[in-house]
A protein has these predicted regions:
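Short, conserved beta-strand segments within well-ordered enzyme catalytic domains
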Residues: 68, 83-85, 94-98, 124-126, ...
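Active-site-adjacent helical/loop segments in soluble small-molecule enzymes
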Residues: 407
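Glycine-rich active-site/cofactor-binding loop and its immediate structural neighborhood
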Residues: 91-130
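Glycine-centered helix-coil hinge/cap
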Residues: 40, 342, 383-384
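An N-cap/entry alpha-helix motif that binds or orients negatively charged groups
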Residues: 2-88, 194-203, 208-276, 412-414, ...
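C-terminal helical cap(s) of enzyme catalytic domains, especially alpha/beta-barrels
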Residues: 60, 192, 329-337, 380-400
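A gly/proline- and charged-residue-enriched helix-loop-helix capping module
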Residues: 120-160
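Alpha/beta enzyme core
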Residues: 102, 116, 141, 158-349, ...
């Protein structure tokens, strides 16, 4: 990736001279607008929306505005290096494709498309626990590419154990445990539309492909509860058809089966556990030798507790503002956590990155790498795998150019001296 900046930039301009426009817009606002125009109202609200009045999401992007890059001149920056080392492996850039669920609402290629996009750039793809396609099929579609797996801690420890084992057997190189979704945040955009994709059978492929979950479904059918049978209307019919279409197997067999609806009911019951404590982490630590990263850390003391309880890495994140409204911007939490950890484990960052300059700022503040989510989802919506790859390539190109324009040749040179804090 030594010249990804100039190569990408030149390729776009050469294409323009021949009448070929870019597949995806380079500007964030235009990219979001293009995705909105492509996606259904329900789908766009789910992807773009955040918690409450979306003040945390606003804080995430505003936090970057408090920093300015201080360029240095007359340095030889002809050769630049974006590589980073994480958990014993070298990666060509500091960018990781963050876990995002229910990708089928963005594009039919869903997780397979995103896995191909990440693999084309050597970027680790973190498969979501709420994927539209099983982790086995997703990982098998890009053999040799770096794959990680994100875990939501279910109320069933047996299911948690099964998911971890499946990820390890499928070739995952790390387990990312998301801590901030032990309850679903209050999301007005979704609430106003009365839309939760999981209730329609979307985004539960990791579950319907899991033997433990399938057993729970079978047991539920064999011992039915007193669940209310909804009165049939057009909305109920659409929901039942959604469940049927998205459940594994033949549509016509599923239409006659109780399994699709029961699977949704079981998922909604076992999805998360609000009683988790630090002591629960030992359960996962005993069941895998893979690096374990804890995602959702925002306080230095929690970062310390994460290390004390065996975490191999920390992801400073607030879920892109989707969980708790009026929380601090994730970037505002980064420096104190980096100082607290003092290089004992890698500290990764996400929430609010929209540009290559944002990535550079996060790295200069001490992040070992960054995770990017919404930007590539919008690219996927606009252009499938090629669109997602183009968005990621644009981010890397801007990072590469800005690394050189700031007078640096490698990620390791970035630090406090690279930035100036804008007090206003």
């Amino acid at each position: 990736m030594a010249s990804i900046g100039r190569d990408t930039q030149s390729g776009i301009y050469r294409g323009g001279a021949l009448g070929k426009m870019p597949l995806v817009p380079a500007s964030w606002d235009a990219l979001e607008a293009a995705a909105r125009a492509t996606m259904s109202a329900d789908a766009f609200a789910y992807v773009a929306g955040s918690a409450g009045r979306e003040r945390t999401a606003d804080a995430n992007t505003a936090a970057f505005d408090a920093w300015r890059i201080v360029p240095r001149m007359l340095r030889d920056v002809g050769v630049r290096d974006l590589t980073v080392d994480l958990f014993g492996r070298s990666y060509p850039s500091p960018v990781i494709a963050a876990p995002v669920g229910v990708l089928e609402v963005a594009h039919p290629e869903a997780d397979l498309g995103m896995a191909r996009a990440a693999a084309a750039l050597g970027i680790p793809y973190v498969a979501s626990n709420q994927a539209s396609i099983s982790l086995e099929d997703t990982f098998a579609s890009t053999p040799g590419a770096p794959h990680w797996f994100q875990l939501y801690w279910s109320s069933s420890d047996e299911l948690v154990e099964s998911l971890i084992a499946r990820a390890e057997n499928a070739g995952a190189e790390a387990i990312v445990i998301t801590l901030d979704t032990h309850m679903l945040g209050w999301r007005p955009r979704d609430l106003d539309l009365a839309y939760l994709p999981f209730a329609h059978g979307l985004g539960i492929a990791q579950y319907t492909s899991d033997p433990v979950f399938c057993r729970l479904v079978t047991e539920r059918i064999a011992a039915p509860t007193q669940s209310e049978t909804p009165r049939m209307n057009s909305a109920v019919l659409r929901t039942l058809l959604d469940m049927t279409r998205h459940y594994p197997g033949s549509f016509w067999s599923n239409l006659r089966s109780k399994e699709p609806r029961t699977a949704v009911e079981v998922f909604l019951e076992v999805f998360s556990r609000s009683s988790l404590t630090w002591q629960n982490l030992e359960f996962v630590r005993k069941r895998t030798k893979l690096p374990i990263l804890l995602k959702g850390i925002q306080h230095p003391d929690d970062a310390e507790l994460a290390v004390e309880h065996g975490a191999d890495g920390i992801i400073v994140s607030n879920h892109g503002g989707r969980q708790l409204d009026r929380a601090i911007g994730s970037l505002d939490a980064l420096r104190a956590i980096v100082e607290k950890i003092n290089s004992r484990v890698p500290v990764l960052f996400d929430s609010g990155i929209r540009s290559g300059s944002d990535i550079l700022i996060a790295l200069a503040l001490g992040a070992s790498a960054v995770l990017v989510g919404r930007p590539w989802v919008y690219g996927l919506a606009v252009g499938g795998a090629a669109g997602a790859e183009a968005v990621l390539r644009n981010l890397l190109a801007e990072l590469d150019l800005n690394l050189g324009l700031s007078g640096n040749t490698s990620i390791t040179e970035l630090g406090a001296a690279t930035l100036s804090h804008n007090a206003s």
